[in-house]
Amino acid sequence: MARTKQTARKSTGAKAPRKQLASKAARKSAPATGGIKKPHRFRPGTVALREIRKYQKSTDLLIRKLPFQRLVRDIAHEFKAELRFQSSAVLALQEAAEAYLVGLFEDTNLCAIHARRVTIMTKDMQLARRIRGERF
């Protein structure tokens, strides 16, 4: 049987309620909600830092395989109608695409930091691509 948390209940004793001090009355102005507890929330940025550490540790692919495969086939269909792909070829394309995106986001983050910001913007990505010598 699972343990349950016991909450304190008001007694129905014979003593009459005493007058509360002003400071105590101000503290207890919000009515008790019958033991309903607010869900725990981390401070802003804590979860983001945890996710950064998690994804920097991992080596697995971050983009789902089937949507990426559909995208590759859709782009290839514009050039030639009857193209077939080995699964290893799609996997190699996905590895290369994710490596490119990670590098681009690293450079974009450096551009945002250079502008004394922590939030990346479109102009940071455009600057990173321009410095790399890519056309956009």
Swiss-Prot record:
Organism taxonomic ancestry: Eukaryota, Sar, Alveolata, Ciliophora, Intramacronucleata
GO CC annotation terms, alphabetical: nucleosome; nucleus
Positions of modified residues (N6-acetyllysine): 5, 10, 15, 19, 24, 28, 37, 57
Keyword Mitochondrion attributed: no
PTM sites of type N6,N6,N6-trimethyllysine: 5, 10, 28, 37
Organism: Tetrahymena thermophila
Major localization listed first in the record, in broad terms: nucleus
SMART domains hit by this protein: H3
Residue numbers carrying N6-methyllysine: 5, 28, 37, 57, 80
Modified residues (N6,N6-dimethyllysine): 5, 28, 37
Protein name: Histone H3
Compartments, as annotated in UniProt: Nucleus; Chromosome
Pfam family, one: Histone
Expression induction: Highly expressed in growing cells, but only at low levels in starved cells.
Gene that encodes it: HHT1
Family under the similarity heading: Belongs to the histone H3 family.
GO molecular function (one): structural constituent of chromatin
Membrane-traversing stretches: none
CDD domains the record matches: HFD_H3
Record's function text: Core component of nucleosome. Nucleosomes wrap and compact DNA into chromatin, limiting DNA accessibility to the cellular machineries which require DNA as a template. Histones thereby play a central role in transcription regulation, DNA repair, DNA replication and chromosomal stability. DNA accessibility is regulated via a complex set of post-translational modifications of histones, also called histone code, and nucleosome remodeling.
Keyword Iron: no
Region (Disordered), start-end ranges: 1-43
PROSITE patterns from the UniProt entry: HISTONE_H3_1, HISTONE_H3_2
Oligomer status and interactors: The nucleosome is a histone octamer containing two molecules each of H2A, H2B, H3 and H4 assembled in one H3-H4 heterotetramer and two H2A-H2B heterodimers. The octamer wraps approximately 147 bp of DNA. Interacts with GCN5, whereby H3S10ph increases histone-protein interactions. Interacts with PDD1 and PDD3.
Residues found modified as Phosphoserine: 11
PANTHER family, alphabetized: HISTONE H3
Protein keywords: Acetylation, Chromosome, DNA-binding, Methylation, Nucleosome core, Nucleus, Phosphoprotein
Processing after translation: Phosphorylated to form H3S10ph. H3S10ph promotes subsequent H3K14ac formation by GCN5. H3S10ph is only found in the mitotically dividing MIC, but not in the amitotically dividing MAC. H3S10ph is correlated with chromosome condensation during mitotic or meiotic micronuclear divisions.
